[in-house]
Amino acid sequence: MIRDIDENLARSLTAETVELLPFLPYLLQDLWELGSSPRDMITLIKRHIPLSENSKILDLACGKGAVSVRIAESLGVHVHGFDLFPDFVKYAEQKAAEFGVDKLCRFTCGDANETVETERNYDCVIFGAAGNILGEPRETLEKLAKTIKFNGFIIIDEAYLPDDMTNDDVKYQNYEYLTRGEWLQLFDECGLTLVEELQNTDDYDFDSDNKLISTRTDELIAKHPDKRAIFENYVASQLNECEDLESNITAITWILQKKD
């Protein structure tokens, strides 16, 4: 079970093997945002979620806290972020203090699969670009739904396969992508209403991120030459995923509401 969790965690961060997990904080040390767009999340929350001083948001697999901190800063709402990497949690806490929202943000080191069994009654849960760490899509949606109130919201950052593509066309084979139609059917079967979707239209600078990661990769190869293949495969996976996002799959952010 632990091995499965580690493997899913590795894949969610574009790592081909669990052997890379101890090195991911080093490889990603120059990045704050690790996949999701805080701006898109804030836009969807503003449009659809009635907030009050008692509102609370759960950010699962929160990474370094970019989404949590930006939401707290922009909306003045309480956010509780969970991530499995202690280094990421520490960085998130530092960023919350830097942005003056440490009273609104709380970060905990923990496994998302355990978190969904204990956290309850949130107004919204965010699951941003975390892949299949909670299981297959149906299982993921069911687990997320348990953490929110009736009529609460799920914001999920995902990608789907265009109708004219197959999974064989995807370069980074981390899991099987569903089509948009398959996702919509799944939402309905899980008692979730699609409220809005935002296609990823940000002109995100993948090249800059990849250069930073490549530099850190070279540093690690110098320190651990016996692991050269693992590090180089990680860079290749990053490049393949970026190419997929640009050409082969459609990145999307959905806001869903739990039906009565």
Could you describe each region identified by the protein language model?
Residues 116-125:
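A short acidic, Gly/Pro-enriched loop at the edge of an enzyme's catalytic core
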Residues 35-53:
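Conserved alpha-helix/loop element of class I SAM-dependent methyltransferases that forms part
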Residues 124-136:
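A short SAM/SAH-binding and catalytic strip from SAM-dependent methyltransferases
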Residues 198-260:
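Conserved Class I S-adenosyl-L-methionine
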Residues 138-153:
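A short glycine-rich, Lys/Arg-flanked "PGG" loop and its adjoining helix->strand segment in the class I
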Residues 58, 66-114:
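Class I SAM-dependent methyltransferase SAM/SAH-binding core
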Residues 1-25:
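N-terminal, positively charged/glycine-rich alpha-helical extensions of SAM-dependent methyltransferases
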Residues 155-175:
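Short, glycine-/aromatic-enriched active-site segment of Class I SAM-dependent methyltransferases
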